[in-house]
Design a protein with these regions (language model features):
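N-terminal beta-rich core of secreted/periplasmic extracellular enzymes
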Residues: 16-193
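Bacterial N-terminal signal peptides
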Residues: 1-11
Length: 193
């Protein structure tokens, strides 16, 4: 009953999204950094150890760390909150090349998920929905980090994981502690599907 009430309440506040053109399916660029079997992440024209998928992981990590500046290492320990929070732009643009994340960023959380604030309607940004357009936009963000930063380290794109996903048209469930208090294994199993 609680889950039904939550689903109905969530749909009452939802707005109908405007139709938008979905960009063509993400296709890798013709950037010369892409080779058969490996990617030249640092764009130096040779396969470094960290770029070699057949090299032992410990060697790859050591090689990458040896090439990183203090600024790049620091940025890999940072989570940047996405569009409408810290990020003012939904997609990479020229200003990103001089922003803090020009050296990469460890993670971007809740980027383009449509959530603005409890009690407010979802963001009307066209890159939130439909899901195919959202995927395209997230791929464009990753393209910036891979193709536009010195070492090409992808960012970890994350979203609220405690209650499912904090995103437009997604179902939010109570926290694990709240679900556990139901003592209803069948209900918990259905939440997981």
């Amino acid at each position: 009953l609680l889950l039904t009430a939550m689903a109905v309440a969530g749909s009452l506040g939802a707005q109908t999204a405007k139709p938008v053109r979905v960009p063509d399916t993400y296709k890798p660029s013709n950037n010369p950094m892409y080779h058969k079997g490996w990617i030249d992440f640092n764009k130096n024209g040779k396969k470094d150890v960290y770029e070699d998928p057949t090299a032992p992981i410990a060697d790859r990590v050591e090689d990458l760390l040896s090439q990183m500046t203090v600024e790049e290492k620091t940025c890999q320990m940072v989570t940047l909150y996405g569009y409408g929070r810290v990020l003012k732009d939904d997609l990479p643009n020229e200003s990103w090349k001089s922003a803090l994340w020009k050296d990469g960023i460890g993670a971007i959380d809740e980027h383009l998920n449509g959530f603005r604030q409890w009690g407010l309607p979802p963001s009307d940004n066209p890159n939130v929905w439909p899901a195919s357009r959202h995927a395209w936009a997230i791929n464009e963000v990753q393209r910036f980090f891979i193709e536009g930063t010195r070492l090409g380290i992808p960012s970890d794109i994350t979203n609220e994981g405690i209650r499912g996903v904090e995103a437009y048209r997604a179902t939010n469930f109570p926290t694990g502690l709240g679900l556990g208090h139901t003592w209803d294994r069948d209900l918990i199993r259905r939440v997981g599907y």
